[in-house]
Design a protein with these regions (language model features):
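Metabolite-binding pocket within alpha/beta catalytic cores that recognizes anionic/polar moieties
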Residues: 1-122
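Generic hydrophobic/aromatic pocket-lining and core-packing "Φ" positions
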Residues: 66, 165, 181-184
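Short acidic/polar active-site loop segments enriched in Thr and Asp
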Residues: 75-76, 174, 193
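Active-site rim beta-loop-alpha module in soluble metabolic enzymes
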Residues: 125-170
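His/Asp/Glu-rich mid-to-C-terminal helical/loop segments that flank catalytic regions of hydrolases
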Residues: 204-243
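Zn-dependent metallopeptidase/amidohydrolase metal-coordination segment
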Residues: 178-216
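Non-catalytic positions within long, well-ordered alpha-helices that form the structural scaffold/packing
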Residues: 70-73, 169, 188
Length: 243
């Protein structure tokens, strides 16, 4: 089974067959999974913010989501994350396969190992095989996808200041968002292959003369939804024979 976790603007899967909802209890809370078959591949789907976009980034129950997917039998997870662009190489509407992260969050529950000493290797947090598969899909579908980018996870829910963005750029950050961590680290703790597609919705704070507009961001997400579904759907097709 393929786990799918989507961010802002993606609240359903077009073409999902045999769709049904299942409540999965975990030690961290219950999670409502949407189960079904997409392009021949069994999938379990979670929209991070809820179907009505009511859960802010710092209140998402990341541990429950990842444990629910693991308990449901997911063998890998593909995720999307809406980002501001720090590196000018990444234009608005760009899809980026994230390969490293920088954690700037605070106050989140970030590990399954609260009561034991465990140091999980984060040298390659995003699965290389999944990233290569996504690039193969992009090539076959004629989609423009950038392979590699450093994602800075800010806490939210506010947007970042220009001073913070300058600091993140100095750290080497290419993208900034609010939801990519601790999801990726939890996947590593579960030994679950995980890949994330960053979608650049806007230049980060202070990098554009135009004021940051939520309406503009939603417009970009609407435009990129079709190629993003093609990318995810193509991956599901290629992974169908695994499960």
């Amino acid at each position: 089974m393929l786990g799918l976790i989507t961010g802002s603007g993606l609240y359903d899967i077009p073409g999902l067959e045999d769709s049904r909802t299942k409540e999965v209890p975990t030690p961290y809370g219950s999670v409502h999974l949407t189960l079904g078959t997409w392009n021949g591949c069994p999938v379990a789907f979670i929209p991070r913010h809820g179907t009505a976009h009511r859960i802010p980034p710092h209140r998402i129950n990341y541990r429950a989501n990842m444990r629910a997917l693991d308990d449901a039998g997911a063998g890998a997870v593909l995720a999307t994350a809406v980002c501001g662009g720090i590196n000018p190489r990444y234009g608005v509407g760009e899809m980026v396969l994230i390969d490293q992260f920088i954690d700037m969050t605070h106050g989140r529950e970030t590990t399954f190992f609260e009561d034991e000493v465990r140091h999980t290797d984060m040298s390659d947090p995003y699965d290389g095989d999944l990233r290569r598969l996504l690039m193969e899909v992009a090539d076959s579908e004629g989609l423009e996808v950038v392979d590699g980018g450093i994602y800075v996870c800010a806490n939210g829910p506010r947007f970042e200041t220009p001073a913070e963005i300058r600091m993140y750029a100095g750290f080497g950050g290419d993208l900034v968002g609010m939801t990519g961590y601790p999801e990726v680290a939890l996947a590593r703790e579960l030994d679950m292959p995980y890949a994330a597609i960053g979608v650049v919705s806007n230049p980060a704070a202070g990098l554009s003369v135009e004021e940051l507009s939520l309406e503009d961001i939603w417009g970009v997400l609407e435009d990129v939804s079709t190629p993003l579904h093609l990318l995810l759907g193509g991956a599901a097709t290629r992974l169908a024979d695994r499960w």
